[in-house]
């Protein structure tokens, strides 16, 4: 499972950088873990170069590389395994089946670990693969989806009734999200040429370990860039927290723990250097190794910190086909080259689109029951410790501390 968390972080950072480049000044919020786990269900049915490209983009080679566990009898029934043996690639088939089993077993274990403590926070994720009904999913593929992901693909009639299929998918998502997401697939997003779409929606709402005080009186200016100001409702907290400073990037990093095993990490540049968000250097420099270093106990120390962050709610919708293709996942979206023979004997499926929607509430949750009053934004008396004043764009990530898995990654650049 540790290897999978490394893979997910690598994928998260790469995906975020591609989205950030495509939308340099907009708010961003996504769940790389949720996207990766949903894509893994598709990956399980891929073969050939389609499989290789998906593994590379999703960083699954980081997981399968160390798979040395003995084969168990049920693994021998994996989709496509017997076909490979018949082609004379017996040793390769065993290694591939071992690696695949490790990937999907790790996702099952990771999901169990993340969902184990959801009594302290709300994490709702909806994942589903919808395929053209004429394709006929393999029974073995359906069984493995149920085994590893507690889900299964659903057949719909894209060919003859695309609009009806879209409404059916939206109705299913709306029901699963208790009405939070009523229209995940917009009009015109599917048609008679659609063969397979992947839907993924996730919502997070956590309770802070130490609640913020009630909202500060009045609105405060949020510096969108060096020239633009937007009024925003700020929240205040004075608490012992882990805080660090990234010297070469001139940025602070702060950990805000939620109740349970989840924390939010905020990365805040000292100042805005130009007319954009001021996050360009931070976004270009962030890597897996650097993030591990920045969030380590060696670089972060507990101190009594005064924290000012805006109250915000993000609800972001993405159609990820173009981004995933730019990352190297070409064949899966190509009608002529896609190989999903592990899903369907006819092998005429290709991925038309990946729809992802993520939502988060960041507020003073729990303050109504806490003693505390509002106040001014600076100049609190009797405090000589550091301040963390997020009155300009910042990056944030929500991490499951037990597994070090990034559940969400975001950029807040404009209220």
UniProtKB/Swiss-Prot annotation:
Alphabetically ordered keywords of this record: Cytoplasm, Disulfide bond, Glycoprotein, Plasminogen activation, Protease inhibitor, Secreted, Serine protease inhibitor, Signal
Subcellular compartments: Cytoplasm; Secreted, Extracellular space
Post-translational modification, as annotated: The signal sequence is not cleaved.
One of the GO biological process terms: fibrinolysis
GO CC terms of this entry: cornified envelope; cytoplasm; extracellular region; extracellular space; plasma membrane
Keyword Glycoprotein in record: yes
Presence of keyword Signal: yes
One function term, GO molecular function aspect: serine-type endopeptidase inhibitor activity
Pfam families in the cross-refs: Serpin
Family: Belongs to the serpin family. Ov-serpin subfamily.
Quaternary structure and interacting proteins, as annotated: Interacts with PSMB1.
Protein known as: Plasminogen activator inhibitor 2
């Amino acid at each position: 499972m540790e290897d999978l968390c490394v893979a997910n972080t690598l994928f998260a950072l790469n995906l975020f950088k591609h989205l950030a480049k495509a939308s340099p000044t907009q708010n961003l919020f996504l769940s790389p873990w949720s996207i990766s786990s949903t894509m893994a269900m598709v990956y399980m049915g891929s073969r050939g170069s389609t499989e290789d490209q998906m593994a590379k983009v999703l960083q699954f080679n980081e997981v399968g590389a160390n798979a040395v566990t003995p084969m168990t009898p049920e693994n021998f029934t994996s989709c496509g395994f017997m076909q490979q043996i018949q082609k004379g690639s017996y040793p390769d088939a065993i290694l591939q089946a071992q690696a695949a089993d490790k990937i999907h077993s790790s996702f099952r274990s990771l999901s169990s670990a993340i969902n184990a403590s959801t009594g302290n926070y709300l994490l709702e994720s909806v994942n589903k693969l919808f395929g053209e009904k004429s394709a006929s999913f393999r029974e073995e593929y359906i069984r493995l989806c149920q085994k590893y992901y507690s889900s299964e693909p659903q057949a719909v009639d894209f060919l003859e009734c695309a609009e009806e299929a879209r409404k059916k998918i939206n109705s299913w998502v709306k029901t699963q999200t208790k009405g939070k997401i009523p229209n995940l697939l917009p009009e015109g997003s599917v048609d008679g040429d659609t063969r397979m779409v992947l839907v993924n929606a996730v919502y997070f709402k956590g309770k802070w370990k130490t609640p913020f005080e009630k909202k500060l009186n009045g609105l405060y200016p949020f510096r969108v860039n060096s020239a633009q100001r937007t009024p925003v409702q700020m929240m205040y907290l004075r608490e012992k927290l882990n805080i660090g400073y990234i010297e070469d990037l001139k940025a602070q990093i702060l950990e805000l723990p939620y109740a349970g095993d989840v924390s939010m990490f905020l990365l805040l540049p000292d100042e805005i250097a130009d007319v954009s968000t001021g996050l360009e250097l931070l976004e270009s420099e962030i890597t897996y190794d650097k993030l591990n270093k920045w969030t380590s106990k060696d670089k972060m120390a507990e101190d009594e910190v005064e924290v000012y962050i805006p109250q915000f709610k993000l609800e972001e919708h993405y159609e990820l086909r173009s981004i995933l293709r730019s990352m190297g996942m070409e064949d899966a979206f190509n009608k002529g080259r896609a190989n999903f023979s592990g899903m369907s004997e006819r092998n005429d499926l290709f991925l038309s689109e990946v729809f992802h929607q993520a939502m988060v509430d960041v507020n003073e949750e729990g303050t109504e029951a806490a003693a505390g009053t509002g106040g001014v934004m600076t100049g609190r008396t009797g405090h000589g410790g550091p301040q963390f004043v997020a009155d300009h764009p910042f990056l944030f990530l929500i991490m499951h501390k037990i597994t070090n898995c990034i559940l969400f990654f975001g950029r807040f650049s404009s209220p």
